[in-house]
């Protein structure tokens, strides 16, 4: 990894709501990063790219279907459970909280996961900061 990147200096890691299969997995499979995430998964927060059983953007839902994976936030939590202990989900997916918590993953709920404006993006960022500082 980059010598200038000191992973230990970060209090938390946030995995943004991007495609887990095409965008995130290739990055978190880098050995040094993967080892760090496995060791410090309590400091890792995933923002779900799935809301109300659909992709926020892009082909995530289609890829999940092609892999015979249920398109929901529970599947996202299962996908990341080895490297993350926290997931941010949309309020429309609150009915999954108990199932997600049974995976020993903290579930944080935001009203702002669907970002249609810059203001929505700022609100989501503020929600995540509140979760990180709780």
Question: Which functions belong to the PLM regions below?
Answer:
Residues 26-35:
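Charged helix-capping and loop-helix junction motifs
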């Amino acid at each position: 990894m980059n010598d200038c990147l000191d992973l230990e200096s970060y209090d938390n890691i946030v995995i943004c709501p991007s495609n887990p299969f095409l965008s995130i997995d290739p990055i978190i499979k880098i050995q040094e990063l993967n080892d760090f995430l496995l060791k410090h998964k309590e400091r890792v927060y995933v923002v779900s790219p799935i809301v109300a059983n659909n992709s926020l953007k892009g082909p995530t839902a289609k890829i999940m279907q092609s892999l015979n994976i249920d398109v929901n936030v529970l599947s996202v939590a299962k996908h990341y459970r080895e490297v993350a202990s926290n997931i941010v989900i949309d309020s429309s997916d609150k009915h999954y909280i108990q199932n997600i918590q049974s995976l020993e993953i903290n579930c944080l709920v935001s009203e702002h996961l669907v970002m249609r404006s810059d203001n929505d993006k700022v609100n989501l960022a503020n929600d995540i900061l509140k979760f990180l500082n709780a």
